[in-house]
A protein has these predicted regions:
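Short conserved beta-strand and strand-loop elements enriched in small hydrophobics
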Residues: 79-87
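Compositionally biased, charged N-terminal/linker segments
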Residues: 1-78, 140-141, 146, 150-178
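Short, isolated positions within intrinsically disordered regulatory regions of eukaryotic proteins
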Residues: 57-58, 86, 126
């Protein structure tokens, strides 16, 4: 990656991360936040401006992680990628369209109230199409990428904030033929 953006037109590293990935096993993000109004503020901007930049504050890294390269591959390949959002007990999902690692140059009309440009940002996610879901559906339908066992996500959601890489839990295959 040579720029501070991950978009469909970026050159993709050959082999490795994300090669041959199907949408059913795609990598997604789950963001848990303590600000109970964050989703509503961002959803309102997305409805007005078509999409919204969702910031994740923290120290910026010099090189993309393996998982960021997977997300880059997915976006470039047109794989539907989701960001799941938990604030309190409310749960939503939105389509991920772009990742930016430098907030300079993003459209300020697509930033929600409360964005603090003085705080370090390790990434902004361009989100579109907010849908409501349930916490139960997320806990039962997603697994951590780092430990893909059913129910393993529940422990990771105990804190007030988290950025988790998740995948959809594959339904059990058909039973033996009779």
């Amino acid at each position: 990656m040579t720029s501070d953006r991950i978009v469909a037109s970026d050159p993709i590293p050959t082999g490795g991360a994300g090669a041959g990935l199907s949408s059913g096993r795609a990598l997604h993000l789950l963001l848990r936040m303590s600000d109970a109004g964050a989703v509503a503020r961002h959803r309102d901007v997305a409805q007005r401006a078509g999409a919204v930049w969702w910031p994740r504050y923290g120290a910026r890294r010099r090189r993309p992680t393996r998982r960021e390269l997977v997300l880059q591959r997915q976006l470039a390949d047109g794989v539907e990628t989701w960001v799941y959002l938990l604030d309190g007990h409310a749960a939503h999902r939105a389509r991920l369209e772009e990742i930016v690692f430098d907030p300079d140059g993003v459209d300020p009309a697509r930033l929600a109230a409360g964005f603090d440009p003085a705080r370090p940002v390790w990434g902004l996610f361009l989100l579109r199409g907010f849908d409501e879901t349930t916490r139960h559906a997320l806990v039962d339908g997603l697994v951590l990428d780092s430990a893909p066992v059913p129910g393993g996500l529940r422990k990771s959601l105990r804190g007030s904030q988290a950025t988790l890489y998740v995948r959809h839990l594959e339904p059990p295959g058909p039973g033996p033929a009779r």
